[in-house]
Amino acid sequence: MITNGVIPGLFTLLLCVGLYRLLVVPLNHLREQANAWRADQLNVRLSRRTTNRADELGELGRAFDHMSERLQSTVALQQQLLRDLSHELRTPLSRLRVASESEQGLEQLRERIGREVDGMQRLVEDTLQLAWLDTERTRLPDEAIQVQALWEMLTENACYESCWSPAQLRCEVDASCWVRGNLNTLAQALENMLRNAIRHSPAGGIVALGGRRAGKYWHLWLEDQGGGVEEADLERIFLPFTRLDGSRPGNGGFGLGLSIARNAVQRQGGKLWAQNAGSGLRMNMRLLVHTSPV
């Protein structure tokens, strides 16, 4: 009788312990990670015992870790942008203070203040755009984009802004180049790259857009005559607020354009990278082919 009562009791105890380790322990780990987030400890990760499980709790654990990594990356970027933005705003604010205390005429003072305010507005808008591109993960609407037509629109604006001749902005991609993506974000990316290329090229230089089809992708490149950059800087130029020394001609800008361009291209499934080519820098884009243009 005693044996008959002990064996079922032991079996029940072992079953409870197994269920506890199988269900309650990983749930406690998930709760601990959620509490760590609440305490701003975004670097906390679940144990491999939880994330390596092949059941729903393992899937939930991996989702928790992915969410934690994403939150940590987003918060780090926003904190870095805030620090950089506050640093970048000091210079125009100092110039505004000097201008307000100067003996310049009213017309000169207005022009100076207008320039500084416009620059600060562009800086803030670009910073907010970069932060939005990094945090906004909803899928953008796809559409068919003819690269040649997009280039013509962008170069018209660029010639007006830079006083360059249209002959200096060449398109070596024919009308058969159609890509799949979001028109607004692709236009912004290509416009930022074009402005960067013009800024760093000599006054009589050439900026050319070329490309070739490679399977289901179009490989496009934008090449300038600005002398290129050091090999070690080819990836660094995509970091926010990165401005290299005087190795390349041209000045101006806040070092946000290429970072925004890369984020914009990546948001539509593309890739953007840089390489030195010829007498300048080549920006390479890989974009999905649109196979049935209309």
Give the role of each language-model region.
Residues 212, 286-288:
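Residue-level recognition of strand-loop junctions within catalytic nucleotide-signaling folds
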Residues 97-213, 217-223, 227, 233-247, ...:
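DHp/HisKA dimerization helices and adjoining segments of the cytosolic kinase module
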Residues 1-82, 94-104, 119, 232, ...:
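Membrane-proximal HAMP signal-relay module
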Residues 39-42, 90, 136, 246:
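Generic structural signal for secondary-structure transition and capping sites
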Residues 279-283:
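Glycine-rich GHKL/ HATPase_c ATP-binding element in histidine kinases
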